[in-house]
């Protein structure tokens, strides 16, 4: 309400000031107004009465306002002037800074223009250098000595090195297996001894058979003569059967009976001896067959090993040719590495070649010798009886046998050791060994290969107390060293 009153007072002061001016010319104002003058005077008087108190107050407020304005106007002007001065100073400072910046920019532009001019001159040079470097890179990548060919050569080298390593490993394995070739001389010596013993036994057996055949033929002749004599004697006795027999005839009959019994015993002994000789011949034939089979197996193994060594040498020569062709394509950088690797590989291959060539020569010579000996053995075994030389001592013994037919034990003594050995060389039996596989297992149990030899004690410890006597095995020991090989045990077992 107070504010409203103050506003009304201010409005009233303004109205009074406006109304006082027309009082100087009331006539004119009245002409303009439509209201009567009486009403105006009344209204003015009323307004003066109403706003008398308010006018006094407004006058007091107006004085205060004027005082404030006298103080504020200079302050505001000073503040505005100071602001203008500060703004001018700032503008001047900014202008100076801008000028410095413009000078610096101008210098930079000048340097840039100079650099640009020089760069325009250097750009073609740089382009030429870039083109030359690009050409060099292309040459390095796809030139004669480029990275592509180097990579291809490196891959070929890796392949050839892998082939060489595989070939070297194969040769190492062959060298390890060549230990059998080293042991060939001993095996060949054993075969020579066994072949010699077989030849001796065959000769003795053939001689004994010839002597037996001659004695049997002569014994048949004597038997026929005796039978004819007996028939004649019986024919002579039949017509004089009714007569009284004197005492000398009785004694002759007794002599004939004893003679016939002796002849029967001699015939039985001859049959037994012939059976023993036949069994001995069968045993010798088995031994010869087994030993010939062993010889054939060893010869075939030797030929296979020689062929393998030859194929390895051929493969190594091919690999060396390929390696030489590929190594010639490499550059100077890889030349040193190649030379070192080739030197190592060639040294190894040369040593292996020399060893293989020596072993081949020795094996070929040994194989040729073995083949010659096998041919001789086959010629001896297949020789007919008609080409064999006669023996005078056998004829003398046959004559003594015909003169004394009851002396057959002397003939057995004449046959001597070959017949006894033939009787003793019958196959024996070992407990748990009935085939070649069982025999191989026996060698494996004792910790030896098939090429090794076993003693009687080793066989006894592996098989037990059911072993036969050592004398029965000694007959099959062709070397006489007290050790039994795989072939000797096969012959002894008859498998």
From Swiss-Prot:
Keywords: Calcium, Metal-binding, Phosphoprotein, Repeat. Transmembrane segments: none annotated. Residues 1-50, 381-404 are annotated as: Disordered. It comes from the Eukaryota. Residues 37-50 have a biased composition (Acidic residues). Ca(2+) binds at residues 477, 479, 481, 483, 488. Residues 434-463, 464-495 form the EF-hand domain. The modification Phosphoserine is found at residue 17. Residues 18-31 have a biased composition (Basic residues). The keyword Repeat applies. GO terms for molecular function: calcium ion binding. This is EF-hand calcium-binding domain-containing protein 14. The gene is EFCAB14.
């Amino acid at each position: 309400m107070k504010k409203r009153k103050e506003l009304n007072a201010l409005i009233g002061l303004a109205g009074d000031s406006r109304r006082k001016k027309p009082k100087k010319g009331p006539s004119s104002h009245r002409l303009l107004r439509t209201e009567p003058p009486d009403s105006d005077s009344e209204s003015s008087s009323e307004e003066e009465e109403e706003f008398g108190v308010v006018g006094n107050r407004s006058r007091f407020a107006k004085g205060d306002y004027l005082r404030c304005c006298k103080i504020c106007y200079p302050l505001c002007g000073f503040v505005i002037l100071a602001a203008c001065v500060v703004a001018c100073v700032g503008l001047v400072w900014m202008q100076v800074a801008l000028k410095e910046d413009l000078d610096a920019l101008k210098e930079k532009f000048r340097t840039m223009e100079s650099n640009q001019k020089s760069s325009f001159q250097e750009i073609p040079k740089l382009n030429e250098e870039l083109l030359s470097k690009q050409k060099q890179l292309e040459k390095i990548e796809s030139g004669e000595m480029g990275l592509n060919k180097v990579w291809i050569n490196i891959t070929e080298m890796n392949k050839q090195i892998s082939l060489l390593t595989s070939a070297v490993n194969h040769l190492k394995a062959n060298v390890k297996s060549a230990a059998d070739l080293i042991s060939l001389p001993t095996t060949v010596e054993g075969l020579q001894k066994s072949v010699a013993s077989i030849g001796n036994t065959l000769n003795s057996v053939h001689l004994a058979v010839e002597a037996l055949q001659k004695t049997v033929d002569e014994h048949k002749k004597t038997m026929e003569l005796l039978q004819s004599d007996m028939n004649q004697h019986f024919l002579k006795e039949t017509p004089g059967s009714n007569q009284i027999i004197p005492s000398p005839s009785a004694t002759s009959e007794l002599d004939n009976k004893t003679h016939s019994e002796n002849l029967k015993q001699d015939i039985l002994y001859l049959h037994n001896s012939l059976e023993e000789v036949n069994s001995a011949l069968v045993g010798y034939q088995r031994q010869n067959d087994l030993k010939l089979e062993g010889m054939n197996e060893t010869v075939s193994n030797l030929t296979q090993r020689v062929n393998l060594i030859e194929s390895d040498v051929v493969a190594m020569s091919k690999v060396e040719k390929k390696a030489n062709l590929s190594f010639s394509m490499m550059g100077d950088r890889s030349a040193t590495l190649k030379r070192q690797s080739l030197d190592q590989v060639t040294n190894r291959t040369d040593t292996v070649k020399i060893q293989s060539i020596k072993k081949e020569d020795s094996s070929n010579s040994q194989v040729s010798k073995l083949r010659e000996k096998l041919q001789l053995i086959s010629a001896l075994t297949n020789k007919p009886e008609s080409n064999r030389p006669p023996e005078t001592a056998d004829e003398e013994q046959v004559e003594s046998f015909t003169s004394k037919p009851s002396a057959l034990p002397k003939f057995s003594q004449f046959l001597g050791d070959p017949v006894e050995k033939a009787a003793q060389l019958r196959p024996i039996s070992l407990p748990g060994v009935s085939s070649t596989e069982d025999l191989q297992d026996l060698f494996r149990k004792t910790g030896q290969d098939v090429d090794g030899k076993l003693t009687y004690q080793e066989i006894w410890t592996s098989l037990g107390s059911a072993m036969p006597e050592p004398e029965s095995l000694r007959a099959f020991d062709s070397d006489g060293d007290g050790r039994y090989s795989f072939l000797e045990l096969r012959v002894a077992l008859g498998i």
